[in-house]
Every structure is written in C-alpha cells, then in structure tokens.
Amino acid sequence: MRQPDSSLPRTGQDHTLSPYEPELGEVPSNDLSMADLDNVNKTGTTTIGISTAEGVVIATDMRASLGGRFVSNKNVQKVEQIHPSAALTLVGSVGGAQSFIRSLRAEVDLYEARRGEDISINALATLAGNFARGGPFFAINPILGGVDDEGHHVYSIDPAGGVMKDDYTVTGSGLTVAYGTLEREYEDDMTNEEAKRVAASGIKAAVERDTGSGNGVFLATVTDEDVEIKGHKDFDEVL
C-alpha cells in the first residue's frame, strides 16, 4: 500500500490528510475543551436570508452572549460583506465565525487571482461548506446571500458542510419563531424594500421569545453592484 507523502499539508486535529484544506495552507486548529467553550462569546442569534426580484436581503439581530447566560454585547454586526456582491452571516461563536470569514475571504481572493474571473455564488457556497466541515469553527451555521450572472441566491450552510439553496431561510436559536413570520409574510418577487420589512419582522418576532436574540436588527441589501449594511436599534425604523 502506498504511504501518504509526509511533505503534504496535514490538519492540526488528527494528522491525517484532509480533502477540505484551503489552498493557502492548513485550516487552523484549536484545543479548547467543552468547559472552555462555555466561556466563549457566542452570537446565539437569529439570521434571515431572502431572495428578491432585485437581489438578496439578509437580516440579523445584534446580541452576543457569554455561556448562554450573560449578554456580553448589544451591538454585534452579524452580517459581513464576503465578496463585492455577496454577504455572509455570523452564527456560532464570535471568534470562530470571524475566523471563518477571514479565511473564506482569503480563499476567494486566491481563487479569483488564479482563475482571472469572479467566483460564482454557487462556487462560493461550496467553498464555504467545505470550510465549515473541515475547520474548527465551533458549529457555525451561516447564511450566504449573493448575486451573480446566474441570478439571486440564498444558501444555508450547516456545521457538517451541507449547502442548501432556497428562496428564503433562517438559522440560529430563534429560527422556529422567525420561520412562522416568513411563512406568513413571504411572497415571490418582492422588492428589496418589501423583503427588508418582512425580514425585520421575522427578527423582531424572534427577539420577543428567544433569549439568544435581541437588541436590534442589522439589514444587508445585496445587489449586482454592492452590499449595503445598516443597523437599527428601533424596529419601527424599518417596519
């Protein structure tokens, strides 16, 4: 039997070759215990992604908690621009989610530099899924929304690396409450402004019942030209 080449990159977790390693090098590892994770800042969270006739709208709450018992921050921006026409939410531990986004941005830049073309949103979602499965990012469950030549896309990415596309999706601790609002208010071919109101309504409903969500809403509007992100402490500003 042929032995693995010891000169090839290996993961820091089990020292076996991984098909999910990024092109830039190894996915970073961690040695945190379950007790350590209880003291990690977590987003808790409710995040929503909606595909519209004009692009994509993403909404998140603003709360971070420590060990699920203490509100450690009331102004966390849980959605970040990941590409000129795509945005990604932060769900899970704050540090893990931020590391995930930094790593993914670097990989996208490398992908486009090597190929001389923009990455498609489908390829970006696949890359994000590979990272979620192969990296120590503490069970993140983000939403990716983007626009490319093929249309407007919303993907949910599960901790095992699964990538699922839908017209709208919800992740986070408040998803059961928010889904009820979206099932009632979502319509095909909404404008971005209409979708922002529906998404904000879903976040508000989750904030009322989910202790991991709260303190306002961030709304991201994604078009083929740019990503605009704005925070609102008062839901009445957008409803």
Swiss-Prot record:
EC class of the enzyme, as a word: hydrolase
Q: Which SUPFAM superfamilies match?
A: N-terminal nucleophile aminohydrolases (Ntn hydrolases)
Name the residues of the propeptide.
Answer: 1-44
Looking at the Swiss-Prot or TrEMBL record, what is one Pfam family this protein matches? Answer: Proteasome
Keyword Ion transport in annotation: no
GO biological-process terms attached to the record: proteasomal protein catabolic process
In this chain, the stretch annotated as Disordered covers 1-32
Q: Does the keyword Zinc-finger apply?
A: no
Q: Name one GO cellular component term.
A: proteasome core complex, beta-subunit complex
- Keyword annotations from UniProtKB, A to Z: Autocatalytic cleavage, Cytoplasm, Hydrolase, Protease, Proteasome, Threonine protease, Zymogen
Enzyme Commission number, as recorded? 3.4.25.1
Activity modulation: The formation of the proteasomal ATPase PAN-20S proteasome complex, via the docking of the C-termini of PAN into the intersubunit pockets in the alpha-rings, triggers opening of the gate for substrate entry. Interconversion between the open-gate and close-gate conformations leads to a dynamic regulation of the 20S proteasome proteolysis activity.
Q: Where is the composition biased (Polar residues)?
A: 1-16
From the Swiss-Prot or TrEMBL record, state where the protein is found.
Cytoplasm
Q: Which GO terms describe its molecular function?
A: threonine-type endopeptidase activity
Which residues act catalytically here?
Answer: T45
Q: Catalysed reaction(s)?
A: Cleavage of peptide bonds with very broad specificity
Please report which protein family the annotation says this sequence is part of.
Belongs to the peptidase T1B family.
* Role of this protein: Component of the proteasome core, a large protease complex with broad specificity involved in protein degradation.
Quaternary structure (record): The 20S proteasome core is composed of 14 alpha and 14 beta subunits that assemble into four stacked heptameric rings, resulting in a barrel-shaped structure. The two inner rings, each composed of seven catalytic beta subunits, are sandwiched by two outer rings, each composed of seven alpha subunits. The catalytic chamber with the active sites is on the inside of the barrel. Has a gated structure, the ends of the cylinder being occluded by the N-termini of the alpha-subunits. Is capped at one or both ends by the proteasome regulatory ATPase, PAN.
What name does this protein carry? Proteasome subunit beta
Species whose genome carries this gene: Natronomonas pharaonis (strain ATCC 35678 / DSM 2160 / CIP 103997 / JCM 8858 / NBRC 14720 / NCIMB 2260 / Gabara)
